[in-house]
Curated annotation (Swiss-Prot):
Domain EGF-like: 306-346
Signal peptide as annotated in the record: 1-16
Superkingdom of origin: Eukaryota
Gene: nas-23
Record-given protein name: Zinc metalloproteinase nas-23
Naturally occurring in which organism (per UniProt): Caenorhabditis elegans
Function noted in UniProt: Metalloprotease.
Tagged with keyword Mitochondrion: no
Length: 537
């Protein structure tokens, strides 16, 4: 990684001098062919996607006043939407034809990385040749360097300044918007990755490079309808094309679970006609996890490592628990999911500052936990408090989130709290960063819940209650979606008979939150429950 940065820093002055003229996106796409395929795919997607009305009770989620003013990638690419697949992907006619053909065959079965019959020719081996074009702004160049360094550090992928390679990544800022190809394509030669004005943040450049390495969007997975619902009435019919599913012949998930917190996932308002949610999480507690721009998630990185066969670097295997795996560049250590740490990923991830950590033991008696990371304009990097809420074997954990202070942004990737309620700890958890209109009730699948309070320079605060409940640990809806108790009954099939109703839990704890405003409710909570665990950083 250090070599990469030094090479780039020393080469800034010469980039763009002798580069060939870059064709425009409109030169690379045959409009007649593209529009014909787009119409077919839009029709197929409309027919194949379950419907839900924009005004149904299932879509009436709380509306937040988001503090971020960042445009979505599809908005940044508004002028080029007709030429791009799913808002920011340039596909060759042949590649797009294969996706349409597979949809026509209705062959949706398990397989988000681009993998077809040409694999492994569709991945970059032994390295990724690249050029940084002189049209890139200083901010875009710096962000691309950081994104390449990230992928180099966390995977076995290596980036190399192009010499004479005919197939390479040509990173440009010549046009508006942010877009890329998917995987390596010999037929294209110079594969353009465009980072225009407004696309300079790390979350976007790492997203576009992930496309170039082979990742499709997360919501285009074959199984996405088990986890999210598309609100078709909020999407123009011509944009149904952008919500198409990519089938197994062109995509591989490598056994990784669907991750709403993936940097490759659409924002909840993507392509929305009225600014409302066009994508609804079937587990309503996961809605604010969708659309983060912090950077690649644990599963995003794991998929690239699998896609490039990085595990082959480690001949001597070590034990990594909770979904962790050997680091492809240091086989003596484990890469652990967020919230976990230690030599084998069995322990708690190290906190910063170190004093805000520990195990919170859940029992039948309800306990309250409060954590507060104070604002600090001089803070450098991420401040993070990590806890594990643990219950005895055979028990599950009920958590009621009463109050949150954070930076209310889509994806809650700045200040906020994350709770991992699923049995699979590799999946991004339920995030909260906006003011709650009423307490949020969740129930775990297992007997451990990692709790992560994250802040930059601003404040992050959470107050919640937790206790145990009897029941089988692997409770899940019949459609296969793994969820916590915060499930929207209008979107899911009925739970199995051993399920627990969230309203019943609220009544059990005498919480009449619907009859009081948030401020009065917080006063009520503070007066009736004793703080047993408090962290003030």
């Amino acid at each position: 990684m250090r070599f990469l940065i030094l090479v780039l820093a020393g080469s800034i002055g010469i980039y763009g001098v002798n580069l060939p003229k870059i064709p425009k996106l409109s030169d690379l796409v045959n409009p007649f062919q593209q529009f014909k395929l787009k119409d077919i795919l839009s029709t197929l997607t409309a027919l194949d996607t379950p419907d839900i009305a924009a005004d149904s009770a299932g879509v009436s989620l709380p509306k937040h006043e988001y503090t971020d003013r960042l445009s979505s990638i599809s908005d940044l690419n508004r002028s080029k939407r007709d030429l791009l697949f799913q808002g920011d992907i340039h596909l060759s006619f042949e590649h797009l034809s294969n996706i349409v053909r597979e949809q026509l065959d209705h062959s949706r079965t398990k397989r988000t990385a681009f993998r077809n019959a040409m694999y492994p020719k569709t991945i970059w081996l032994p390295n990724v040749p690249f050029e940084l074009h002189g049209s890139l702004s200083a901010k875009s160049r710096s962000s691309l360097v950081a994104a390449m360094a990230f992928w180099e550090k966390h995977t076995c992928v290596a980036f190399k300044k192009r010499t004479s390679e005919k197939v390479y990544l040509l990173m440009s800022g010549q046009e508006e918007g942010c877009w890329s190809t998917v995987g390596r394509d010999e037929a294209q030669g110079a594969q353009i990755l465009n980072i225009g004005t407004g696309c300079e943040m790390f979350g976007i450049t790492s997203h576009e490079i992930a496309h170039a390495l082979g990742l499709f969007h997360e919501q285009s997975r074959y199984d996405r309808d088990n986890y999210v619902q598309i609100v078709k009435s909020r999407i123009a019919q011509t944009n149904f094309y952008d919500f198409a599913v990519v089938g197994k012949k062109n995509m591989e998930t490598y056994g990784q679970k669907y991750d709403i917190g993936s940097v490759m996932h659409y924002r909840p308002t993507e392509f929305s006609l009225d600014g409302g949610n066009s994508i609804i999480a079937k587990d309503v507690n996961m809605q604010n996890t969708m659309g983060q721009f912090r950077g690649p998630s644990f599963i995003d990185v794991a998929k690239i490592n699998r896609h490039y066969n990085c595990e082959k670097n480690c001949k001597n295997k070590i034990t990594c628990l909770n979904g962790g795996y050997q680091h492809p560049k240091n086989c003596k250590i484990c890469v652990c999911p967020p919230g976990y740490g230690g030599s084998d990923c069995k322990g708690i991830e190290a906190s910063s500052p170190a004093k805000c950590t520990g195990v919170l033991v859940a029992g039948e008696t309800q306990r309250k936990f409060t954590a507060n990371i104070k604002p600090n304009k001089n803070a450098k990097g991420i401040r993070k408090c990590n806890y594990h809420i643990e219950a005895p074997p055979g028990k599950r954990i009920v958590i009621i989130v009463d109050s949150v202070i954070g930076n209310c942004v889509q994806g809650c990737y700045e200040e906020g709290v994350e709770l991992k309620m699923y049995e699979d700890k590799t999946v991004t958890g339920a995030r909260f960063c906006c003011k709650l209109q009423k307490p949020q009730t969740l129930i775990s699948q297992g007997n451990t819940v990692p709790l992560m309070l994250v802040a930059g320079k601003a404040q992050a605060f959470v107050q919640l209650r937790y206790s145990t409940v009897d029941g089988p640990q692997n409770r899940s809806p019949k459609d296969g979606n793994a969820t916590s108790i915060g499930v929207n009954p209008f979107l899911l099939e009925k739970y199995q008979d051993n399920s627990i109703d969230s309203e019943a839990i609220r009544k059990e704890y005498h919480i009449q939150s619907d009859n009081v405003n948030q401020e009065d409710f917080e006063t009520l909570v503070r007066s009736e429950f004793i703080d047993e665990n408090t962290a003030d950083i």
